[in-house]
Amino acid sequence: MEVRPIGWICGQVVKNFSGRLEGLQKAIMDLIDEFKDDLPTILRLSQSSQKTDPVQKTSKVRMALALAKINRGTLIQGLNHISSSSKSVAKLLQPRLAYRLLELRSISHRLLREVNVASQPLHSVQMKRGSLFEIISFPAKTALTSIMYASYAALIYLAVCVNAVLAKIKKIFQEEESIRQNRESENFRKAFSEPALRKPMFSESEIKAKPYRSLPEKPDNLLDQPKPPANKQSNKIQVLHSVFDQLAELNE
């Protein structure tokens, strides 16, 4: 429930009392009208009494003077505020009063039952002591159970976090394994598709380009060598022809 300041509560009380004081308002207004009519005579009498025998003003005259000075509209407005505040305070206090009355009724019924009950045996007294101990230990039990529930909640949260971290680590390892397998398969495919070339044993600077020739150059010393005889050359040609004939027969 919201805490209100004392001034607001007093204002509400005054405001709520206005509805119940309508008769009082009417009586006060009639009294003011009556004193306003008799006020000049009262003032003259008071002045003459002061000249002859100074006597203190009575409470009635003072009240008449005070009421004459009060404005009727402001008085009615204040009484209306009092009535409305009293109503609001009554609305606020009504649930509490009803709850307190119910508590008092339950307590009175319980006390009446305990008074009217006859003398009880020993085991009932022990049961009462046990119930009293349970009542005393109830806050400790509730605190312990709340601590246990909080620890269970913390363990569940920790397990969820650990599972999430393990899932992320497993995913990272799976990605690395897939990347490694892809690399191995790619290297294996390259190894079978493209033959490995051996590196040359000599450097590129040692390679010298030579002009292309369809026929080998005749060395000069061949001119000096003697030519074979004609019969030997004819014999070699015959041997070659016979070899070619045999190969043709075999192919057929």
Curated annotation (Swiss-Prot):
This is Spermatogenesis-associated protein 9. Residues 208-235 are annotated as: Disordered. It is a single-pass membrane protein. GO terms for biological process: cell differentiation; spermatogenesis. Its main location: membrane. It comes from the Eukaryota. It comes from Mus musculus. The chain crosses the membrane at residues 145-167. It is found in: Membrane.
